[in-house]
């Protein structure tokens, strides 16, 4: 049986901000059509890792990286069309990032920039993305309203809809639910479970219960290192990751005190 090529493959990845190394030689694979969880405390390198995957780190002054990142077996950093590649990898930040545009134009912005001009196509795509972000019913009668007029939680869902408008192959979510109420979070989690049928999802979260609900596999990072990786199907495995995390943090604090 031929082994399937991973959707994302990371090999001996290292990253720096200036002289400070923030990711220390980590390697892992992410399969197609899976939700892959990344957990860890603040400053563990999770967000920097996402930036290396969607090639935004190289636009950060003073940053550099070494190692391999592949998508479908091809070297991501060998792709000359950076913006074409980034279209394939959607990114949702922890807090909403709104464009000073209407709700409709926030979602239609990327498709238009990639050449979609047919209004019926745009209308259908805007509705689909807003539905996927659990926002359509709340805004369908005011699509001409500025997105910045929405509540914080609604703006975050608009950010998710905008990321989906790229029709990405990989969707990176960096603690997407931090600004969203629990009910809406559960709605979007249901959507993510459906989306994994058509894309790969990388979920950075500090909520272990969320990783347990969504991720097939989860890896734990600490101080830029990959500490543990494993299946998250069973509660005991997650609890073991937590136990090890608490032990590691305790010893780290003792060493630094």
Kindly label every feature range from the protein language model:
Residues 68-84, 144:
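ABC ATPase NBD Q-loop/coupling interface
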Residues 166, 197:
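Conserved signature/switch motifs of ABC ATPase nucleotide-binding domains
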Residues 54, 104-113, 123, 127:
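Short helical segment in ABC ATPase nucleotide-binding domains corresponding to the A-loop/adjacent helical element
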Residues 171-174:
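Catalytic Walker B motif of ABC-type/P-loop ATPase nucleotide-binding domains
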Residues 225-252:
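Conserved beta-strand-loop-alpha-helix hinge in the C-terminal portion
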Residues 74, 120-141, 254:
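Conserved ABC ATPase "signature" region
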Residues 199-204:
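Conserved H-loop
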